[in-house]
């Protein structure tokens, strides 16, 4: 195959734009020292990449997966939740401070309506300023 055209590769990769992305990615791999799978024949890296795709020496699905992986900046890994670790830490803190979370959650100060009104009447209104 003296000349490689998009028509030679389009039956392997359906989308022309995806073909260009895959060939460009493979050409970068070749320029970084990756082993080529076809004869170079004094061709440049993009042509060699297209020839590899056309002759199916490389799987387009593998190239696509490698391209996606190379473009990812942050790979999120699903980790198991640490609910049991939180439970052990909270029980440790209860033993250290000799308190339980139930006692802290149920203690409220009770105030009658008269005490609340007396507290509100005792508030001083701040002077109005031109700051705002």
Swiss-Prot record:
Residues 96-105 have a biased composition (Polar residues). InterPro entries: DNA-dir_RNA_pol_omega, Pol_omega/Rpo6/RPB6, RPB6/omega-like_sf. Pfam families: RNA_pol_Rpb6. GO terms for molecular function: DNA binding; DNA-directed RNA polymerase activity. Belongs to the RNA polymerase subunit omega family. Promotes RNA polymerase assembly. Latches the N- and C-terminal regions of the beta' subunit thereby facilitating its interaction with the beta and alpha subunits. This is DNA-directed RNA polymerase subunit omega. It comes from Bartonella tribocorum (strain CIP 105476 / IBS 506). The lineage of its organism: Bacteria, Pseudomonadati, Pseudomonadota, Alphaproteobacteria, Hyphomicrobiales. The gene is rpoZ.
């Amino acid at each position: 195959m003296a000349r490689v055209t998009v028509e030679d590769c389009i039956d392997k990769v359906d989308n022309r734009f995806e073909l260009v992305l895959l060939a460009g990615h493979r050409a970068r791999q070749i320029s970084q020292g990756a082993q080529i799978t076809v004869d170079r024949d004094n061709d440049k890296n993009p042509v060699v990449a297209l020839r590899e795709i056309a002759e199916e020496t490389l799987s387009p699905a593998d190239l696509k997966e490698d391209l996606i992986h190379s473009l990812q900046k942050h790979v999120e890994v699903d980790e198991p939740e640490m609910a049991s670790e939180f439970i052990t830490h909270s029980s440790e803190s209860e033993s250290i401070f000799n308190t339980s979370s139930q006692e802290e959650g149920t203690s409220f100060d009770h105030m009658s309506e008269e005490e609340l009104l007396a507290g509100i009447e005792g508030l001083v209104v701040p002077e109005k300023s031109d700051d705002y």
